[in-house]
Every structure is written in structure tokens, then in C-alpha cells.
């Protein structure tokens, strides 16, 4: 019987300063899990910097690395969907490129899914240390509102950093929403989820790509798509 495959999806937008760092951190972690095979799927979301060249170099150097590149910036949700659609793994995990999602959690996530008690291992921040106060306040207000008006299990402080079984990934892909809001979809499909908590980790390099207006549009997508209240 062959090794189980872990697919690691990493959306990237102008992350030339971080993609090599996250690659090294992931490979170091996976070297400690020789019983599993893995693929790293970078999705270049129309970056305007040197991200694509960095990804090309990594893929030429390491057969574990693949990349997909958009012609323009379609947004993180589109990149996540493209990654899920191309992932072949028995287990699939989504991570940010900026090292705010610690690869050191991967062994615990795999072990949890291997137990058979859960179909998903999700993560949430228990603090927003280092984040602008206005952004933290708006985020807390959004989560309070969405929990009041939606049946989807959307947890305050939830990250996109999540590992899922193949069955759950297939269920997520089966949903045909045009404007996708992954945090809501992951809760909506109803699989058993274990939550891991950790302190906020500031990005290692580069700048956040989430302006106030992008965050507002993202929040409105979540409210419109998952509200039980007539809008």
C-alpha cells in the first residue's frame, strides 16, 4: 500500500519575499513525516512582483512543488478554489504564504485526521497582537454579526489554515457558489471539525494585501451568502 498524499495549497499575491521561506519551513516539517508523500501547490494570484519567477525556480528544483498562475488578480477565494480543484491528496491543507500559519502544526493536524474522529482540523487565533486596532475591531464585529444571522459554523478568529479529508474537499468542491466565502462553506458542509488555537503570528516579510475596502467586500460576501435574514 502506497503512502498517503498530503496536498498543501498556498495562495500567493506579491509574496516574493516569503515563498522561499514557507517552502523551506514546510519541507523541513515534512522531512519529519517520511511516512507521507506531499505536494506543495502554489497558486499565483496575478502577482506583479517576482513571485512567479520564484515559484518557477522552486518547481524546477523540487518535484514536490507545483504552481498555477492567474492572468490577473482574482482574489484569495479564487486561488483557494483553484488549489482545491487541483489537489490530489488524501488530506488537503490550506496555508498562507506569509508564515502566519505555522507549518509546525502539520504533524498534529495529520495525526488528528488519522484518528478517524474528525474530518477537518481548523485553526483560530486567540489574540490579534500586532494587528491594527481598527481591523481587529471590525473583525470582531463581523464575527458577532455573522453568528447571529447565519447557521454556518463561522468561528471568531478563524484562519483559512485548515486540513481536510478527501471526502470533505469533494463536498466543498460540489458547491456551485460563484462568490465563494470559504470560511462559511467549510462550516456549512457540516463535517466534524477540531479547532486548534494559537497566538497571532505576525508575517515574516512583505505587507498585508488586505486593504480596508477588500476586507469590507470580503465581509459583505460572507453576509450575503450565508445570512438567514432577508436582505
Positions of PLM-derived features:
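Structured catalytic core of nucleotide-sugar glycosyltransferases
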Residues: 1-131
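Alpha-helical structural elements of signaling/regulatory helical domains
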Residues: 14, 18, 35, 174-178, ...
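Residues at helix C-cap/C′ positions in short coil/turn segments immediately following an alpha-helix
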Residues: 34, 116-117, 150, 227-230
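Acceptor/aglycone-binding surface of glycosyltransferases and processive sugar-polymer synthases
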Residues: 57, 68-72, 76-86, 91, ...
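Loop-to-transmembrane-helix entry motif
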Residues: 74-77, 226-231
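Short, structured loop/turn "capping" segments at alpha-beta junctions
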Residues: 179-180, 192-197, 230-231
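Flexible glycine/serine/alanine-rich "lid" or loop that lines and gates the nucleotide-sugar donor pocket
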Residues: 188
Amino acid at each position: 500500500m502506497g503512502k498517503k498524499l498530503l496536498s498543501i495549497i498556498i495562495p500567493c499575491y506579491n509574496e516574493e519575499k516569503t515563498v522561499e521561506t514557507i517552502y523551506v519551513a514546510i519541507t523541513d516539517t515534512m522531512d519529519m513525516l517520511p511516512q507521507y508523500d506531499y505536494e506543495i501547490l502554489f497558486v499565483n494570484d496575478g502577482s506583479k512582483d517576482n513571485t512567479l519567477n520564484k515559484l518557477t525556480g522552486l518547481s524546477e528544483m523540487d518535484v514536490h512543488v507545483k504552481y498555477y498562475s492567474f492572468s490577473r488578480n482574482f482574489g484569495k477565494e479564487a486561488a483557494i478554489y483553484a488549489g482545491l480543484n487541483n489537489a490530489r491528496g488524501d488530506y488537503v491543507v490550506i496555508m498562507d504564504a506569509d508564515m502566519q500559519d505555522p507549518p509546525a502544526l502539520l504533524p498534529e493536524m495529520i495525526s488528528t485526521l488519522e484518528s478517524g474522529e474528525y474530518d477537518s482540523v481548523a485553526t483560530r487565533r486567540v489574540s490579534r497582537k500586532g494587528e491594527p486596532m481598527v481591523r481587529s475591531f471590525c473583525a470582531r464585529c463581523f464575527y458577532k454579526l455573522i453568528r447571529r444571522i447565519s447557521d454556518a459554523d463561522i468561528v471568531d478568529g478563524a484562519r483559512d489554515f485548515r486540513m481536510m479529508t478527501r471526502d470533505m474537499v469533494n463536498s466543498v468542491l460540489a458547491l456551485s457558489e460563484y462568490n465563494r466565502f470559504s470560511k462559511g462553506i467549510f462550516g456549512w458542509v457540516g463535517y466534524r471539525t477540531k479547532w486548534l488555537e494559537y497566538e497571532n503570528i505576525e508575517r515574516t516579510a512583505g505587507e498585508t494585501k488586505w486593504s480596508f475596502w477588500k476586507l469590507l467586500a470580503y465581509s459583505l460576501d460572507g453576509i450575503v451568502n450565508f445570512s438567514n435574514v432577508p436582505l
